[in-house]
């Protein structure tokens, strides 16, 4: 028999019907390259987002952290509880329930900052919430996991990658701080950088989703219940975050910001924790869940963006008409109204 008909083209040694095929390291190389490229791009995008953050307003959120406190309740109150309820209600395996809870306990992702710009959110609040949630995750993640995972597993077996959290914090704070400085010193140049960065950020979000699908295409076969949870979880976060912020008396543009910060999780951190905490056998059951959550949090974020753009075009209104002027919240029209003209309806 002709060996060429049975041997793999990648075979390095053939003897009869027996072939030795070297293991492909394409995914490992692609993962390393793309991880490096995406990290650099993300830092550049966060620098551009920082160009829309005003130092005085950012410090104002720190000094009067009512918006941050609402976000904290959503991030480490609503999301872990929602994950727990979904896990119990669906009756999934213990290891799967733990992964769902890990996702619920993660801090907000930087993608929320990019999307907050596109829906005319409060960029100062968005950046401060992401920074604070990442910092507080150092203590809140172990606490939330201890509270909610006791019925399934010893929380001590879950490895919290404090180094990854620290890197995420540095990768967020440094570029944004530089962007804030540029906005303070050269506001006109900052607007140009912001426009370019906002478009690059939108492309980056899509690129991350595509790369994830390519790298882990063989892992998409997973229990249907996890697909259902991965669909419900992000939209529940968006909805509950919005309504809690509204219940707390926050203006509409901040409600949208809190909604995004609540539903959009740091899925990369979740994937890291899962890989560090579970055996290869368990990983086969759960590894895809962070990818599923990533896909649906982006899908629903795109839907929210589309609804917002449609609403503005149909009604011709901006947030200034909806800002409640109270003694506790006498903010002027947000600066993003003057910067982000992309979704302003045409005026005669």
Curated annotation (Swiss-Prot):
Molecular functions per Gene Ontology: bile acid:sodium symporter activity
Cytoplasmic topological segments: 50-87, 148-157, 217-224, 306-348
Region (Disordered): 327-348
InterPro entries: BilAc:Na_symport/Acr3, Bilac:Na_transpt, Na+/solute_symporter_sf
Record function comment: Plays a critical role in the sodium-dependent reabsorption of bile acids from the lumen of the small intestine. Transports various bile acids, unconjugated or conjugated, such as cholate and taurocholate. Also responsible for bile acid transport in the renal proximal tubules, a salvage mechanism that helps conserve bile acids. Works collaboratively with the Na(+)-taurocholate cotransporting polypeptide (NTCP), the organic solute transporter (OST), and the bile salt export pump (BSEP), to ensure efficacious biological recycling of bile acids during enterohepatic circulation.
Keyword Ion transport attributed: yes
Subunit note: Monomer and homodimer.
PANTHER family reported for this sequence: ILEAL SODIUM_BILE ACID COTRANSPORTER, SODIUM-BILE ACID COTRANSPORTER
Regions that span the bilayer: 29-49, 88-108, 127-147, 158-178, 196-216, 225-245, 285-305
Extracellular side: 1-28, 109-126, 179-195, 246-284
Protein family: Belongs to the bile acid:sodium symporter (BASS) (TC 2.A.28) family.
UniProt topology in membrane: Multi-pass membrane protein
Swiss-Prot/TrEMBL catalytic activity: taurocholate(out) + 2 Na(+)(out) = taurocholate(in) + 2 Na(+)(in); cholate(out) + 2 Na(+)(out) = cholate(in) + 2 Na(+)(in); taurochenodeoxycholate(out) + 2 Na(+)(out) = taurochenodeoxycholate(in) + 2 Na(+)(in); tauroursodeoxycholate(out) + 2 Na(+)(out) = tauroursodeoxycholate(in) + 2 Na(+)(in)
Modified residues (Phosphoserine): 335
Name listed for the protein in its UniProt record: Ileal sodium/bile acid cotransporter
GO annotation terms (biological process): bile acid and bile salt transport; bile acid metabolic process; response to bacterium; sodium ion transport
Subcellular location: Membrane
Free-text tissue specificity from the UniProt record: Expressed mainly in ileum and kidney, low levels in cecum and proximal colon.
Keyword terms of this UniProt record: Glycoprotein, Ion transport, Lipid transport, Membrane, Phosphoprotein, Sodium, Sodium transport, Symport, Transmembrane, Transmembrane helix, Transport
Residues the record marks as carrying a glycan: 3, 10
Keyword Phosphoprotein: yes
